[in-house]
């Protein structure tokens, strides 16, 4: 609650300052309204050109462009105040570039394509073209109906980690679930295991303090907040990271709807029985999760890594439980 109030105050103050700055400009040039119009016309043209140049999705940017062109003063003020997604444009561009760079690790095995029934081949091609991840067949998949079923398996695999642990979640909240996980992560980090955490800054805004990554670094755990909330970079906090996954040694990946918070394992759930499921994957598809995580990590940190060092060799594993 304290974190939520503190972060809310920061954002509110930032918004007030931004609006105040715009008002002061207009009051200062009150007797020269023509000058203001010219300034905003020039600024709006520059902003539109910038949006067109950096756009990764014209359908998303077009409403802003139209608003600015039709109402230069109003549209420009609104974008500068509320357009937080454009202040994050550098991050989005880094993600886009990193994902493109990592396509070299995600080649579809043509032998698998030939095995798939023609009725499903179009679905595979669609997912491969748009999600840009290959299908694989050498996998074991286990489904968990509830978070409290998923959780013990996650803890067990974390305790077995020898090389790396990558965790990415929308919500990370203090409580029993996080405490038990952190105990394992601290121990593993002390033994030289590469432990990395990504959490969404908006999703965890009421739970974690702004210096949480620094706190974890004292234990040797690397941590970054995704798309950090800043009152001076707009309040339109779009582009959130809703992914929930853990990858361990390239051998096993966990995903699903379970965040790191007690209600997801039905401890102290104020809303009754909490229903979210999860899956555990062992096999070739784990590397897809590794690439997903590293794409976001290296878009933020910009580490030049060969991701093949995180790929586990499953050539001795023979399993055919469908396609992942």
Where are these regions (language model features)?
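N-terminal localization/anchoring segments of enzymes in phospholipid and broader phosphate metabolism
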Residues: 1-324
């Amino acid at each position: 609650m304290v974190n939520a109030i503190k972060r809310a105050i920061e954002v509110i103050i930032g918004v007030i300052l931004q609006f105040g700055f715009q008002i002061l400009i207009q009051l200062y040039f009150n007797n020269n309204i023509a000058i203001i119009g010219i300034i905003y016309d020039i600024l709006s043209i520059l902003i539109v050109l910038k949006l067109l140049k950096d756009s990764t999705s014209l359908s998303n940017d077009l409403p802003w462009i139209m608003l600015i062109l039709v109402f230069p003063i109003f549209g420009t003020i609104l974008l500068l105040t509320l357009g937080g997604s454009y202040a994050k444009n550098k991050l989005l561009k880094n993600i886009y570039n990193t994902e493109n760079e990592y396509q070299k690790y995600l080649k579809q095995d043509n032998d698998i394509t030939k095995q798939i029934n023609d009725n499903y081949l179009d679905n595979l091609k669609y997912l491969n073209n748009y999600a840009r991840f290959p299908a694989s067949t050498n996998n074991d998949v286990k489904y968990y109906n509830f978070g409290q079923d998923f959780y013990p398996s996650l803890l067990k695999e974390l305790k077995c980690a020898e090389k790396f642990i990558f965790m990415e979640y929308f919500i990370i909240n203090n409580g029993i679930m996080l405490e038990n996980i952190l105990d394992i992560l601290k121990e593993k980090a002390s033994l030289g295991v590469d432990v990395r955490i990504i959490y969404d800054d908006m999703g965890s805004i009421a739970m974690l303090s702004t210096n949480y990554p620094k706190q974890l670094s004292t234990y040797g755990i690397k941590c970054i907040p995704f798309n950090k909330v800043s009152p001076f970079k707009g309040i339109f906090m779009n582009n959130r990271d809703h992914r929930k996954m853990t990858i361990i040694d390239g051998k096993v990946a966990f995903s699903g709807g379970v965040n790191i918070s007690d209600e997801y394992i039905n401890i102290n759930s104020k809303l009754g029985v909490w229903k979210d499921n999860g899956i555990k994957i062992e096999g070739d598809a784990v590397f897809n999760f590794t690439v997903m995580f590293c794409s976001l990590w290296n878009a933020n940190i910009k580490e030049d890594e060969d991701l093949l060092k995180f790929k586990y060799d499953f050539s001795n594993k023979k399993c055919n439980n469908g396609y992942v």
